[in-house]
């Protein structure tokens, strides 16, 4: 059996403890309380506000965490108003992996339905001010990046470093590790989530399939016996810190709103840069990179 360990808790009101924690790598996950009291989002981010102010934001309810699965295209407010409806009953239309409309209902399971996918920070830049400043700015270099440079980095790594996940009760994020040894953080604004994490040395895949902490299949994953699983229920206003290369899984115990951020600091900056240059090296032509630079930094040069 896996060995369950309660994730450590810290308070942001203990700066020496926080400093020591981040200086350690961080080497283990941690749930931090009292970290976002100064954010306007701590009071303003809820389903009622998002449904009211951003009702017409168009996106899609993804059929899986990974890209390339399509889902149900609809408005954010419509999704929130229909949390408890089967996916096919939510007003909207089906889209394929390329986000083109589908004529027929795709094969899917309600158990695999993930999160509402849209671009909140691009559509509503004021949201950034509502989650600023980061509680521990010395340990998060990303918050100091100009928006155009951040946009370029995200284009190169093909991943957003900051996202808002709105999902229904029971939505699962399968075990995965984040990119380029970034540090991850999850802040819960609505509902609660069960989180399970495995360190890099305590996780073993099986033919590329992720281990499911909710269905302990030791026949397929014999290596997972006696491995350490760090667990906790992440509650409203709490921040989970995910160390680099740690595998993590979440299960929404309620309808949920979560802020996800990935960042680097002096401990993992070199690792991120190596990953960045690896991504650049995989580009088919130099013109591809030049186009990204022109798109995101061109205005800054004039």
In which residue ranges do the predicted regions lie?
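N-terminal accessory scaffold of Fe(II)-dependent oxygenases
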Residues: 1-239, 249-302
């Amino acid at each position: 059996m896996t060995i369950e360990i309660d994730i450590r808790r810290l308070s942001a009101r203990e700066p020496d403890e926080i400093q020591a924690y981040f200086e350690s790598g961080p080497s283990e996950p941690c749930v931090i309380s009292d970290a976002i009291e100064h954010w306007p989002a701590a009071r303003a981010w809820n389903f009622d506000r998002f449904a009211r102010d951003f009702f017409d934001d168009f996106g899609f309810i993804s059929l899986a965490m990974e890209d390339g699965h399509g889902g149900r295209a609809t408005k954010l407010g419509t999704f929130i108003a229909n949390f408890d409806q089967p996916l096919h009953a939510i007003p909207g239309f089906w889209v394929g992996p390329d986000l083109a409309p589908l004529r027929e209902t795709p094969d899917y399971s309600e158990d695999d339905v993930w999160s509402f996918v849209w671009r909140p920070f691009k559509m509503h830049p004021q949201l950034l001010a509502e989650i600023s400043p980061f509680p521990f700015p010395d340990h998060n270099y990303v918050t100091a990046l100009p928006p155009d440079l951040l946009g370029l980095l995200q284009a190169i790594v093909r991943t957003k470093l900051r996202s808002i996940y709105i999902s229904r009760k029971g939505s699962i994020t399968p075990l995965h590790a984040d990119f380029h040894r970034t540090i991850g953080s999850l802040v819960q604004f609505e509902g609660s989530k069960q989180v399970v994490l495995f360190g890099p040395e305590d996780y073993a895949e099986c033919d590329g399939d992720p281990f499911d902490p909710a269905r302990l299949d030791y026949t397929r994953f014999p290596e997972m016996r006696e491995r350490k699983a760090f667990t906790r229920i992440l509650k409203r206003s709490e921040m989970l810190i995910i160390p680099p290369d740690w595998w993590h899984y979440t299960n929404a115990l309620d309808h949920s709103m979560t802020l996800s951020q990935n960042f680097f600091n002096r401990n993992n900056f070199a690792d991120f840069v190596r990953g960045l240059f690896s991504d650049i090296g995989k580009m088919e032509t130099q013109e591809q990179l030049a186009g990204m630079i022109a798109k995101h930094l061109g205005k800054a040069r004039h």
